[in-house]
Amino acid sequence: MLKRISVQQLTLGMHLKEFCGSWMEHPFWRTGFVLTNPKDLEAVMASSIKEVWIDSDKGLDVAAGAPAVSEAESEAQVEAELKQVSDGQRQIAPIPAALELQRAAKICLHGKQAVVSMFEEARMGKAVDGGGARLLVEEISDSVSRNPGALISLARLKTADDYTYMHSVAVCAMMVALAKQLGLDEAQTRSAGLAGLLHDLGKAVMPAEVLNKPGKLTDAEFAIIKSHPVEGHKMLMVGVNVDPMVLDVCLHHHEKVDGSGYPKGLKGDEISLYAKMGAVCDVYDAITSNRPYKSGWDPAESLRKMAEWTNGHFDPKIFQAFVKSMGIYPVGSLVRLTSGRIGVVIEQTAKSLTTPCVKVFFSTKSNMRIVPQVIDLSRTDGTEKIAGREDPAKWRFSDLNELWSGLPKAPW
């Protein structure tokens, strides 16, 4: 039986199923093993992780009566939290996703090339081309205004090799969407986008063999990676009239509200609004993307994981606004409908976060592919609903991304 417990309850002999936190910030590159080495237990205790999942069927259990949350209880808590932000009208996108996707693909390609150039300039000690960066943010912001789901979802289709560059584009787009959801003015929204674009500039000077290492990082290597906010801040300071918001997000996007983040261990209101926004956007893109050491999670699953971590990692109000901007089932999420059909979310609708447009293509009743059909769940009068999310790894649909994007592969 899976149980979520505090790391303080963790003992040798327990089967460590999963960490309650982003995999970039715990001391292991794998999970799903029995803790037998005292040094491994010490490493978990010394990390910023506060809770873990254990499997009591494969290892020791917590003591009778000890506090623990079952998988069903945790899921109910998360769904209840997401339900709180699901009601209410959404602003409908002016342009359908299908029409914006082609234009967004070109912006992603241009964006990746621009970020590559920025990183190369930074490595040589040159100031970032602020004018070029602002023009790119303007392009991305305009695309998000036309249809936020298009570019944000496309930018997720990065490979492990181009992750660092496309991650900057993706976080920029999500920062813009989140700023709009929070009601920030146009100037603040563009600044938030610029901060997202440049937040990881410090990775330009991280050793490639460490940045792209497919296995567990040593303590020394992890310390190197954790230096990238400070290094990026130094690089940005080379420029003239750099927006303070950009500097702030670059330096503090790995801070957590409980004080367990880095580089300064800030907590609560010590962290600015914009750095809190950056933290949410950064983690979401990281855990939904394929990395050298791990495949990305499904978008809907990722939001639910982040909801589990909200109390320690994120500002709850910022996270709720992020969910509103993305949808409870973001574009690209694999879902099962009450009819037994499986489909992929292709667009959000204005009515509710729980009634997106879904392209169904598989029947669980016949266990066969069916002719793809787009269903707007906001117009079914409740006769068809999302019954739950599905694990893409279980079904292994090789064309899942093509089904929602219309593109056979990422064009960058």
What does each of the following model-derived ranges do?
Residues M1-V128, I386-W412:
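Membrane-cytosol interface segments
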Residues A98-W412:
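Histidine- and acidic-residue-rich, metal-dependent catalytic cores
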